[in-house]
């Protein structure tokens, strides 16, 4: 996948840049914008349409939509195509995690129309009345979403969301830097690779891997089990098992042979593997997390019609085929998922490696060993946050 852009992407990563024809702005998780549009030398706000976040009603002037999602999570040619087709300017910004997105929303420092959070965060946003129900009459491509991705626990009546991607969390490891294939979450807590291990910088995934290793559900509401998991991570941290924690940093360090083991997502693994075939991916024997990221519209969105147009465009079969090919995350669009192997062969003149395809679109027997994160009661969210803060105090 992404064979056409593989060399360009590799060079961009090596230079520490994300090169594109479209403007994508990264947001400072401490609040506000980072001041520059990624892939540009132009300060945000100077002659670039992606630099403003003022919103627009879409009537009597330029139409626009502001989208917040994760980094390197879209084929940017789709942004340009949507703009060309509709005349709607897309202000596309990125944040590193669900927790940072939530924090920015709470601070009131961002005003998105569309966001693309993960399942458990969607549940929380619905519970706290952040989202508005969608007008599915404006999203005819919702019919193309496979039934198994509808009416899930985070949106049981399917009032607020259109799935964007799905995938799994696992362990990525460098086969030249470990003594044997990894099969268990034990690798994340063992001294065997001390100083050469990274974990994801959010409490849900970090404590989740410990809960799974201990044999508990990632959705446990037992405070003692949660504290045991936090203590396991803290002990490994104190023993020097971890080189550190991160999000985008994990991608670059693993791809560059600079760390042996990390927890990360299947789609990102496949992007790394494209440039480093020393890497392997495993769903540990104890199980893992499978997730859905979905498109939602904020209750106070300023560009509601434009937001619906964007969601419908991104739910189309063509957009899903191209996006799946670019970002390596599986599509919830049933047609795209079924067509992809044949589409790939037509695009690149060779068969798709089905082993890689099954990492991207995990078969049911793998998903049966995984759990989706469910929203936790407020008191447990507070406990997670407190334990996470204590860990790095």
Question: Where would I find each of the regions flagged by the language model?
Answer:
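C-terminal motif of bacterial Sec signal peptides marking the signal peptidase cleavage site
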Residues: 18-21
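Bacterial signal peptide processing site
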Residues: 23-26
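Early extracytoplasmic/lumenal segment of secretory-pathway proteins
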Residues: 51-124
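Extracytoplasmic ligand-binding site segments that recognize negatively charged/polar headgroups
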Residues: 68-75, 111, 116-258
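Periplasmic-binding protein-like
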Residues: 227-236, 275-299
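Mature extracytoplasmic/periplasmic domains
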Residues: 298-365
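Conserved C-terminal helix/tail region of periplasmic/extracytoplasmic solute-binding proteins
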Residues: 360-393
């Amino acid at each position: 996948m992404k064979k056409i852009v593989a060399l360009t992407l590799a060079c961009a990563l090596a230079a520490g840049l994300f090169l594109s024809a479209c403007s994508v702005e990264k947001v400072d998780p401490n609040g506000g914008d980072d001041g520059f549009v990624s892939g540009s030398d132009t300060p945000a706000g100077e002659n670039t349409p992606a630099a403003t976040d003022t919103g627009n009603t879409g009537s009597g002037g330029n139409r626009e939509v502001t989208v917040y999602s994760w980094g390197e999570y879209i084929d940017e040619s789709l942004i340009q195509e949507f703009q060309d087709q509709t005349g709607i300017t897309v202000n596309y910004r990125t944040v590193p995690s669900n927790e940072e997105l939530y924090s920015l929303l709470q601070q009131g420092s961002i005003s998105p129309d569309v966001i693309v959070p993960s399942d458990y965060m969607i549940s929380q946003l619905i519970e706290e009345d952040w989202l508005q129900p969608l007008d599915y009459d404006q999203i005819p491509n919702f019919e193309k979403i496979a039934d198994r991705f509808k009416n899930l626990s985070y949106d049981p009546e399917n009032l607020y969301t259109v799935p964007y991607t799905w995938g799994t969390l696992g362990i990525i490891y460098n086969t030249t830097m470990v003594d044997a294939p990894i099969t268990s979450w034990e690798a994340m807590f063992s001294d065997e690779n001390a100083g050469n291990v990274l974990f994801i910088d959010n409490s849900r995934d970090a404590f989740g891997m410990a809960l799974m290793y201990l044999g508990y559900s990632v959705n446990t509401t037992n405070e003692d089990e949660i504290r045991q998991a936090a203590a396991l991570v803290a002990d490994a941290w104190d023993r020097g098992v971890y080189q550190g924690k991160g999000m985008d940093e994990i991608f670059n360090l693993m791809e560059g042979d600079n760390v042996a083991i990390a927890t990360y997502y299947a789609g990102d693994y496949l992007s790394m593997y494209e440039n480093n075939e020393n890497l392997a991916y495993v769903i540990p024997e104890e199980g893992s997390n499978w997730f859905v990221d979905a498109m939602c519209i904020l209750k106070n969105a300023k560009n509601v019609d434009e937001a619906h147009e964007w969601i419908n465009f991104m739910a189309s079969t063509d957009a899903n085929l191209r996006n799946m090919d670019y970002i390596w995350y599986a599509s919830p669009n049933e047609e795209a998922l079924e067509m992809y192997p044949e589409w790939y062969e037509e695009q690149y003149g060779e068969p798709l490696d089905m082993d890689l395809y099954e990492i991207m679109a995990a078969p049911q027997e793998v998903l049966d060993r995984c759990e989706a994160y469910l929203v936790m009661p407020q008191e447990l969210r507070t406990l997670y946050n407190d334990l996470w803060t204590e860990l790095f105090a």
